[in-house]
């Protein structure tokens, strides 16, 4: 994907959850809100913060102001969607491709987007980036002027005019000579996937939006996912509220996969079980075959979407099922979020492009961003006085994805060896860890919530932002009772988690001054702050982890992101935009049984 306009189009407008609960299950909405968002919790955790602020003014496309420390970040300009995570058998590494623009202060300017490429063997260390597909195609009647999202796969011998074993990229883009219509092109590589300079089909599209069997709305024709299936190639293409499905025997000439039907996967199929009102557009589809522990194999359809009337902003979803006789996806489950956070989008996946080959585990990474604020101008200071940054674009840590026998996916983060490891064991309300260098154990409280007083457990300021936290919460008497609160502050910006282990529900709230006075005024800043609950309340999600004697949470922080991982493999990713290299990390809890404790392990992470 991406939008050629300076702001997301009108059909990406989100409706505030708080104003639309009457259109949802009212009982469920009220239960969620009343359970997690008591007045005490919303007020208490904003008190007693030790804040550090740094003003940074950076205006270079290679500025380090918004550069992550251990997450993959574009070397310059702007980046968003991942294209493919493909194993390179010749080089013994993974090829990664992602969308790139010249500058992040206006990343959606038509004609600016190209592909960047890097490689990795361990998803911790990445090689220097290079341009893989140029923003402008070769001069031809129907060439492209901006390269958007697509797929890379190895030619198995059936793609016409391409050497067997060569990598081939299928990608969407904007047509150069007709004002920017969306179509699909192809190109192949003669340097083992580093660049794609040999264009297929005379630089004419292999899928054209204007054909009578392609996009019904004659606008959206992007993000092709190409796989091998039963001796032919299938292409899944994002087409507004549908996914078009096409077949080809030579990789150039395409037709409907279902010759007697519309050959579309509709919203009621790929978002089965979720309220689909205001959920267009679908983007970035990807098909993989995965094997469950019981030996059975299933096709998994991943895609980007949103479900505002289910309380979900844009994110990455998956649904499990199989392909029918024509290659159209048939669901066997309801759709689920792969990551429950607001900023895991434009994701892609390893695994075989041959659907006959099943993977027990695949790897995934997502763009840390949200089109409702990330592309609308980010300042380099909390007071939002600087010019918009010209360098922005980071990705989540890679995750191992495994499909369980219940047809749910478990996500496990891949991180490097931590350094400067510190352990704090048996931390309790009576023996907390506080102060600079963890030098104090003076207890204090921080207001009240549903289950009583909120107690401090850990409050250590001015730590480096590149941290791994392993948090083992437990109760010495029974199941863990009482809320768990994690507050992470960069200057005056924050990410705050409020988790209830008794029912598994949690709330995440955020604030970033760098989003103020954006290209669309305060709209982007307000969306980041309000979420879909409104009034600064962010989002509510269900972790599925409840009534446990102990709970293990993993928290990964870097300059541009925070990632929470629950023990059942559920995750929540959120972007942040402060340029400060330091953060304050705080843990609070209720303790109605007088038995709650936490063991804390923290370490620094880097790409070195």
Describe each model-derived feature in a short phrase.
Residues 47-64:
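Sec-dependent signal peptide cleavage junction
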Residues 1-15, 19-20:
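Eukaryotic endomembrane contact-site and trafficking scaffolds
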Residues 59-595, 602-607:
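Carbohydrate-active catalytic/glycan-binding domains of CAZyme proteins
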Residues 27-40:
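Bacterial N-terminal signal peptides that target proteins for export
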Residues 18-29:
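Short, Lys/Arg-enriched N-terminal segments with co-localized hydrophobic residues
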Residues 38-50:
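Bacterial N-terminal signal peptides
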Residues 6-9, 30, 50:
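Low-complexity intrinsically disordered segments
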């Amino acid at each position: 994907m991406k939008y050629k306009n300076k702001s997301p189009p009108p059909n990406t407008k989100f409706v505030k959850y708080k104003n639309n609960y009457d259109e949802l299950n009212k009982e469920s909405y009220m239960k969620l809100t009343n359970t997690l968002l008591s007045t005490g919790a919303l007020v208490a955790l904003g008190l007693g913060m030790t804040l550090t602020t740094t003003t940074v003014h950076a205006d270079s496309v290679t500025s380090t102001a918004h550069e992550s420390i251990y997450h993959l970040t574009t070397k310059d300009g702007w980046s968003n969607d991942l294209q493919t995570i493909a194993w390179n058998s010749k080089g013994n590494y993974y090829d990664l491709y992602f969308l790139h623009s010249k500058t992040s202060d206006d990343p959606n300017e038509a004609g600016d987007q190209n592909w960047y490429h890097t490689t990795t063997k361990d998803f911790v260390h990445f090689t220097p980036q290079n341009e893989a597909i140029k923003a402008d195609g070769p001069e031809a009647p129907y060439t492209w002027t901006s390269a958007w999202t697509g797929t890379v796969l190895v030619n198995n011998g059936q793609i016409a005019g391409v050497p067997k074993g060569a990598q081939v990229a299928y990608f969407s883009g904007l047509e150069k000579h007709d004002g920017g219509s969306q179509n699909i092109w192809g190109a192949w590589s003669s340097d083992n996937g580093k660049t794609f300079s040999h264009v297929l089909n005379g630089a004419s599209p292999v899928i054209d939006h204007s054909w009578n069997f392609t996009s019904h709305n004659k606008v959206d024709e992007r993000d092709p996912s190409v796989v091998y299936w039963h001796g032919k190639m299938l292409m899944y293409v994002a087409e507004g509220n549908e996914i078009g499905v096409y077949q080809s025997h030579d990789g150039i000439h395409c037709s409907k996969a279902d010759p007697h039907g519309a050959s579309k996967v509709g919203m009621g199929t790929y978002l089965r079980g979720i309220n689909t009102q205001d959920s267009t557009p679908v983007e970035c589809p990807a098909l993989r075959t995965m094997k469950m522990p019981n030996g059975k194999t299933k096709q998994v359809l991943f895609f980007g979407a949103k479900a505002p009337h289910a309380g979900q902003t844009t994110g990455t979803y998956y649904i499990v099922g199989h392909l029918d006789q024509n290659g159209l996806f048939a669901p066997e489950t309801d759709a689920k979020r792969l990551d429950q956070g607001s900023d895991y989008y434009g994701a892609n996946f390893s695994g075989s492009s041959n659907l006959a080959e099943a993977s027990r585990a695949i790897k995934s990474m997502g763009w840390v961003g949200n089109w409702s604020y990330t592309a609308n101008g980010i300042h380099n200071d909390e007071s939002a006085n600087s010019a918009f940054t010209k360098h922005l674009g980071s990705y989540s840590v890679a995750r191992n994805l495994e499909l369980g026998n219940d047809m749910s996916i478990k996500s496990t983060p891949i991180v490097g060896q931590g350094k400067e490891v510190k352990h704090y064991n048996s931390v309790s309300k009576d023996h907390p860890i506080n102060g600079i260098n963890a030098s104090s154990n003076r207890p204090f409280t921080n207001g009240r919530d549903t289950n009583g007083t909120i107690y401090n457990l850990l409050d250590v300021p001015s730590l480096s932002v590149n941290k791994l936290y392993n948090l083992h919460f437990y109760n010495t008497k029974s199941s863990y009772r009482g809320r768990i609160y994690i507050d992470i502050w960069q200057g005056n910006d924050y990410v705050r988690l409020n988790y209830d282990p008794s029912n598994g529900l949690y709330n995440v709230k955020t604030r970033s001054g760098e989003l103020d006075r954006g290209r669309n005024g305060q709209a982007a800043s307000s969306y980041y702050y309000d979420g879909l609950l409104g009034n600064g309340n962010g989002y509510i999600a269900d972790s599925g982890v409840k009534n446990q004697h102990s709970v293990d949470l993993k928290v990964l922080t870097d300059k541009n992101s925070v990632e929470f991982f629950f023990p059942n493999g559920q995750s929540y990713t959120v972007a942040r935009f402060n340029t400060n290299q330091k953060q304050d990390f705080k843990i609070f809890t209720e303790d109605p049984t007088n038995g709650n404790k936490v063991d804390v392990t923290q370490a620094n992470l880097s790409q070195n």
